[in-house]
């Protein structure tokens, strides 16, 4: 049922892209050759570098270093390794998947663009099936998954491709030589260390690697300076989902509920005045003083496949006065958001049928940042590209998710069947020659980013970043000089729908 993008591809190329030919690529006795990883544990010549007045060890010397193990970064690492590059993936947590796993952002929204699934995205969905998680509900096009299963799948994909994962490693800084990054500095469980690489991919979501290297960037809405609001998502267990379904779909006759358990969701969005039936319930809570207007503004919940009686809560939406790009404000948002979370949960337990025995079973390990920093790259995507449904010869994916700018009075949709494309040039900058940026922090305006930020699109961008990194290294082409449309079609994850309109 999922969207699928098909390109002509030779069997051998397909095997390389899906990791079947990855075995044996990482060999310690050939450090320095393409497709190898040299680690401090088995290669003394990795040595040390001087940083901040002291010598620190070099943990890895690799072809490609990816910072950030979210949807984009994981895809980039897997595809770089599958295409022959020795690859290290840095992740600050203890699981890959980013917001999908650590942030409770669930499920994957649909791009609404026909044939948008690139091979990597289609593979993730198929692997969910192989693990007993059917991602489609038969009605909607969103991808239902299971966070813990998804983390396992990403581990498996990295292991099969030969990606070295460095968990609990926080990116600290970069080391530059001219217009190239030569190493990044990370804080590990053992202290500061360096990773040398020929090409670096920023999958941090916050453009941290790019900013540390001196790439130009911007943040927030050009008109107000505000970031999109943060969320502090959580899960609730002990829910009688069938009772909840009967109440919402039968008693309230909420026609918005298209699917039924085990695939079921509820929602209300008072701030958008969409007149969901549950808005009345939340409004009564405001009137009685049980919850605040801020807490009642937005509430959404989804059942989680493989977790009976558990729902993923897409709330609270933290007020826009808290910033995703200010460390002090962000920290205060955590405290404020947790209070909102408990108020909402307590109110639902008291007032929403089916929640009588519910409880908070898990809170996200990171806030949900919809938007923070974005690079200024060789092509700057704007809302004009959205409205014009722009096509590019170097397009790496397509999407049609609506302009979903929380906190601003902006919400627009393309006509059915419409879409725009994202060019490779939006992933690279003029200033840093061996840097590729993947995910929600690519070169785009605030409004356009509100459309391309969803996880399947970020996966496709990361997929292309990994392919491009490996291809450029194999031909000694700088990352910011790569012509995506010069890569043979059979090796690309996406081929533009048509010649560029611009």
Q: What are the language-model segments listed below?
A:
Residues 59-70:
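Beta1/beta-strand and adjacent pyrophosphate-binding region of the FAD-binding site
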Residues 175-194:
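Conserved beta-strand-loop-beta-strand element in the redox core of flavoprotein oxidoreductases
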Residues 1-13, 35-38:
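N-terminal secretory signal peptides
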Residues 73:
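N-terminal Rossmann-fold NAD(P) dinucleotide-binding loop
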């Amino acid at each position: 049922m999922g969207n699928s993008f098909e390109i002509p591809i030779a069997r051998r190329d397909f095997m390389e892209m899906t990791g079947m030919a990855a075995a044996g690529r990482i060999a310690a006795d050939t450090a320095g050759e393409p497709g190898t990883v040299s680690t401090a544990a088995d290669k003394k010549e990795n040595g040390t570098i001087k940083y901040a007045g002291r010598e620190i060890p070099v943990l890895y010397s690799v072809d490609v270093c990816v910072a950030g193990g979210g949807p984009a970064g994981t895809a980039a690492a897997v595809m770089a390794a599958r295409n022959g590059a020795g690859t290290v993936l840095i992740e600050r947590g203890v699981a890959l998947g980013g917001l999908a796993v650590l942030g409770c952002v669930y499920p994957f929204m649909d791009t609404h663009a026909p044939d948008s699934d690139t091979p990597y995205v289609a593979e993730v969905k198929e692997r969910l099936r192989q693990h007993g998680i059917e991602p489609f509900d038969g009605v909607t096009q969103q991808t239902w998954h299971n966070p813990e299963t998804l983390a396992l799948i990403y581990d498996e994909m990295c292991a099969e491709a030969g990606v070295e994962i460095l968990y609990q490693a926080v990116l600290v800084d970069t080391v530059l030589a001219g217009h190239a990054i030569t190493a990044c500095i990370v804080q590990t469980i053992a202290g500061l260390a360096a990773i040398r690489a020929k090409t670096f991919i920023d999958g941090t979501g916050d453009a941290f690697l790019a900013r540390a290297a001196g790439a130009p960037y911007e943040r927030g809405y050009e008109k107000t300076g505000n970031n999109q609001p943060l969320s502090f998502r959580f899960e609730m267990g002990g829910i009688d989902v069938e009772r909840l379904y009967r109440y919402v779909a039968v008693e309230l006759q909420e026609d918005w509920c298209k699917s039924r358990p085990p695939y079921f969701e509820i929602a209300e969005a008072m701030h958008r005045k969409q007149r969901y039936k549950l808005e009345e319930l939340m409004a009564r809570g405001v009137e009685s003083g049980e919850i605040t207007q801020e807490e009642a503004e937005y509430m959404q919940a989804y059942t989680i496949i493989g977790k009976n009686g558990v729902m993923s809560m897409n709330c609270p939406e933290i007020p826009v006065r808290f910033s995703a790009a200010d460390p002090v404000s962000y920290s205060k948002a955590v405290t404020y958001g947790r209070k909102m979370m408990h108020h909402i949960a307590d109110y639902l337990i008291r007032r929403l049928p089916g929640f009588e025995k519910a409880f908070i079973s898990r809170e996200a390990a990171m806030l949900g940042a919809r938007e923070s920093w974005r690079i200024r790259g060789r092509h700057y995507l704007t809302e004009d590209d959205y409205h014009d449904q722009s096509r590019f010869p170097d397009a790496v994916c397509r999407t049609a998710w609506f302009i979903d700018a929380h906190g601003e009075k902006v919400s627009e949709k393309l006509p059915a069947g419409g879409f725009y494309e994202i060019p490779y040039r939006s992933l690279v900058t003029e200033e840093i020659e061996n840097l590729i940026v993947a995910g929600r922090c690519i070169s785009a305006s605030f409004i356009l980013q509100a459309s391309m930020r969803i996880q399947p699109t970020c996966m496709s961008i990361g997929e292309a970043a990994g392919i491009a990194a490996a291809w450029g290294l194999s031909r000694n082409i700088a990352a910011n000089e790569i012509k995506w449309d010069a890569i043979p079609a059979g090796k690309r994850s996406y081929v533009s729908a048509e010649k560029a309109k611009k």
